[in-house]
């Protein structure tokens, strides 16, 4: 690929709720761009993008496969790197990870379901990473499909600025095609060629007025972002050319000022080519993005890199996958410079140079070998020994650390053991590999019981992990019952003097600190340790202060009630003293750990549990039962709405501890007619009676409360 083709590159992802038809849409894109010969249907478990066996069985997408494809638009051939992201709440890490490296996204919605809870979560994640997007309303052929209602919801629920650039011709089973408001033509797809052919005709007479009205709204919206267009819009809108509209829409989209909206039915092969055209027309290329900013690991200074192959190399590893044929594949996005097969590249986290033996561009899980991956492109490499998700790969002579991604902490854990003791090594090897791939999945050994506990974002997440252990690593596991990841907090401030002295012949140990330990300030929102140093006059030498801080940070991993980590803590180091010979960094660290244990026991320790934001869609007649059941589960109903299809939407906050097996219970209450989705919201204090029960179970005693 020539260097100047970067403006024809699009790194995009499709983000959506579970059933918005995201994988089907990706499949159609691959079909029309000529990469797949037979369309893979999710219904029959043959979709090319869903390449792990469990995905094909469950019909949901778990790992974002990165696929490179090409599309001709307006006389140019565009290169599209397509990242398929999962929509299930348990897989937020995958979504965060892919959004970090995209330039633009297609937000897919179901024309019947509209903006669903997960769509909201993903939308906010895309805002966080400043990803411009266009929206695609899928499933226009389904009964209850309503494009304009989804436009309204995008405004109301997401606070977006939607701008329809097409309107549907018909809906539900009469959905025939689209009116393109930019070209002012009607597009009809041919069923006999699976939608590969379509005809462009005049707009049907009964839609002319509606099309003119929506075109006018579109022009008014984009004219705000283009002065020349604004003048024409007020003088004589009929003189506005197609090129001017496309240019203004592109600028407004790249600035994230508007979200162009399209619609179609991927399953019925209608609307996908228009979507591809407008991906090329409106979404940014790597050149539209600002220079990537990172920090120099040696000096801590901020540096930026241009999206050009001539600049020094910088790339971000965004996914690690184990492939049965080539071993460990590392997916990365190159921001500047280039990575060549057979060359050495520096990892700024590990401080080591690694040889990239081979490079691939992926088509789903088939690899096409390439020699070089340049700035603005996405690819995968083999040969890395020590690499984690979020690592920066760069030039050893010009090291840089790009902003990594932050992932939510796991909320649910289960103890696992292999069915046969001889599989113990296989299990620990498998778990270590899976934890490398997925930052929201953690493995630890419970100190009291010696059991291996795996933690993740939900029951489905852990089911899939156990399933993968069986398939990929051939280890069958016994599982304990799910455990909630509680946290602890303290409610009072305690002033304490702690002295640590040890004489054991020769040089001793000595540290003396006076601290105030209590809850964090209200404006300290990031959690963790808030450390304030108020020591005057060198009573504790400067070099020992970080050791005190480190001691508290280490100690916070184990609370005094039941060993759960402390959510947040404020420590003010007021004063202290030291011994010129016996004091060292370790003495002050141990002193801080002792101070923590003694102070927290007196500081009103409480237990905190994860609270989930739950949304249940249920038929009207089951409403009472659903709410009654939520009350039994200590749920707080926060609101009820009616959906267009006549169902009721119940929104509630419910403790995770009460939600195990909820999907099955809900099915029973509503005879399988209700659906639910839940996402972690926050940790909240547990009432003392429940805290006592939890402590009895975990510690066998509850006398600390």
From Swiss-Prot:
Any one biological process term the GO annotation gives: ribosome disassembly
Record's subcellular location: Cytoplasm
InterPro entries: EFG_II, EFG_III, EFG_III/V, EFG_IV, EFG_V, EFG_V-like, EFTu-like_2, G_TR_CS
Chain ranges of the tr-type G domain: 7-287
SUPFAM superfamilies: EF-G C-terminal domain-like, P-loop containing nucleoside triphosphate hydrolases, Ribosomal protein S5 domain 2-like, Translation proteins
Chain segments carrying region Disordered: 291-312
Pfam family, one: EFG_C
Compositionally biased region (Basic and acidic residues): 302-312
Entry binding sites for GTP: 16-23, 84-88, 138-141
Key words, A-Z: Cytoplasm, Elongation factor, GTP-binding, Nucleotide-binding, Protein biosynthesis
CDD domains: EF-G (cd01886), EFG_III (cd16262), EFG_mtEFG1_IV (cd01434), EFG_mtEFG_C (cd03713), EFG_mtEFG_II (cd04088)
Signal peptide: none
Keyword Protein biosynthesis included in the entry's annotation: yes
Gene Ontology CC terms, in alphabetical order: cytoplasm
Molecular function terms, GO-annotated: GTP binding; GTPase activity; translation elongation factor activity
NCBIfam families given in the database record: EF-G, PRK12740.1-5, small_GTP
Entry's family note: Belongs to the TRAFAC class translation factor GTPase superfamily. Classic translation factor GTPase family. EF-G/EF-2 subfamily.
Protein role: Catalyzes the GTP-dependent ribosomal translocation step during translation elongation. During this step, the ribosome changes from the pre-translocational (PRE) to the post-translocational (POST) state as the newly formed A-site-bound peptidyl-tRNA and P-site-bound deacylated tRNA move to the P and E sites, respectively. Catalyzes the coordinated movement of the two tRNA molecules, the mRNA and conformational changes in the ribosome.
Name of protein: Elongation factor G
Source organism: Bacteroides fragilis (strain ATCC 25285 / DSM 2151 / CCUG 4856 / JCM 11019 / LMG 10263 / NCTC 9343 / Onslow / VPI 2553 / EN-2)
């Amino acid at each position: 690929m020539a260097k100047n083709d970067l403006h024809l590159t699009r790194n995009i992802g499709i983000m959506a709720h579970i059933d918005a038809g995201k994988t089907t849409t990706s499949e159609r894109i691959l079909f029309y761009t000529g990469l797949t010969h037979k369309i893979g249907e999710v219904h029959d478990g043959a979709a090319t993008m869903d390449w792990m066996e469990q995905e094909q069985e469950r019909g949901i997408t778990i790992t974002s496969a990165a696929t490179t494809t090409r599309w001709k638009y307006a006389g140019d051939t565009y290169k599209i790197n397509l990242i398929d992201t999962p929509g299930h709440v348990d897989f937020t890490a995958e979504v965060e990870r892919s959004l970090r490296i995209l330039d633009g996204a297609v937000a897919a919605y179901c024309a019947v379901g509209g903006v669903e809870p997960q769509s909201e979560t993903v939308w906010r994640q895309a805002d966080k990473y400043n990803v411009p997007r266009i929206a695609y309303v899928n499933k226009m052929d389904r009964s209850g499909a309503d494009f304009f209602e989804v436009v309204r919801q995008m405004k109301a629920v997401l606070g977006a600025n939607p701008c329809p650039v097409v309107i549907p011709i018909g809906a539900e089973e009469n959905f025939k095609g689209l009116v393109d408001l930019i070209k002012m033509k009607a597009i009809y797809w041919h069923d006999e060629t699976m939608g590969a052919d379509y005809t462009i005709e005049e707009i049907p007479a009964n839609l002319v007025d509606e099309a003119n009205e929506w075109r006018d709204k579109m022009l008014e919206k984009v004219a705000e972002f283009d002065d020349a267009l604004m003048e024409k819009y007020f003088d004589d809108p009929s003189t506005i050319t197609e090129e001017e509209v496309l240019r203004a829409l592109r600028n407004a989209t790249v600035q994230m000022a508007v979200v162009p909206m399209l619609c179609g039915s991927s399953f019925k092969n209608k609307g996908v080519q228009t979507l591809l055209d407008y991906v090329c027309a409106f979404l940014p290329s790597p050149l539209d993005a600002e220079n990537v900013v990172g920090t120099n690991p040696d000096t801590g200074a901020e540096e930026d890199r241009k999206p050009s192959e001539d600049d020094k190399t910088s790339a971000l590893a965004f996914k690690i996958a184990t492939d049965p044929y080539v071993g460990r594949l590392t997916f990365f996005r190159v921001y500047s410079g280039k990575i060549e097969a057979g060359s050495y590249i520096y990892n700024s986290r590990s401080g080591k140079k690694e040889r990239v033996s081979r490079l691939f561009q992926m088509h789903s899980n088939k690899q096409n070998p390439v020699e070089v991956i340049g700035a603005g492109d996405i690819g995968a490499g083999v040969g890395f020994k020590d690499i984690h998700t979020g690592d920066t790969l760069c030039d050893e002579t010009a090291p840089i650390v790009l902003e990594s991604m932050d992932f939510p902490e796991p909320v649910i854990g289960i103890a696992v053991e292999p069915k046969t003791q001889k599989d113990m090594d296989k299990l620990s090897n498998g778990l270590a590999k899976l934890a490398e791939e997925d930052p929201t999945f953690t493995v630890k050994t419970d100190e009291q019981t010696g059991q291996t506990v795996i933690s993740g974002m939900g029951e489905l997440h852990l089911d899939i992990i156990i399933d993968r252990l069986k398939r990929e690593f051939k280890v069958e596991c016994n599982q304990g019952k799910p455990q909630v990841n509680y946290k602890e907090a303290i409610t009072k401030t305690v002033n304490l003097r702690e002295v640590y002295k040890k004489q054991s012949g020769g040089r001793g140990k000595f540290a003396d600190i006076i601290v105030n330990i209590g809850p964090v300030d209200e404006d300290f929102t990031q959690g963790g340790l808030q450390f304030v140093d108020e020591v005057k006059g060198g009573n504790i030498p400067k070099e020992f202060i970080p050791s005190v801080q480190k001691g508290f940070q280490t100690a916070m991993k184990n609370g005094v009630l039941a060993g759960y980590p402390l959510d947040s803590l404020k420590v003010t180091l007021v004063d202290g003293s030291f011994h010129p010979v016996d004091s060292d960094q370790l003495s002050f660290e141990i002193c801080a750990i002792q101070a923590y244990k003694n102070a927290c026991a007196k500081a009103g320790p409480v237990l905190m549990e994860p609270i989930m934001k739950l949304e249940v869609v249920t038929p009207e007649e089951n409403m009472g039962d659903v709410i009654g059941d939520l009350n039994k589960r200590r749920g707080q109903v926060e609101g009820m709405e009616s959906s267009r299809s006549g169902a009721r939407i119940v929104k509630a906050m419910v403790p995770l501890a009460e939600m195990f097996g909820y999907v099955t219970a809900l099915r029973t209450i509503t005879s399988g007619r209700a659906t639910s989705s839940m996402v972690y919201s926050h940790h909240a204090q547990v009432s003392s009676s429940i805290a006592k029960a939890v402590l009895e179970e975990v510690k066998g005693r509850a006398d600390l409360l």
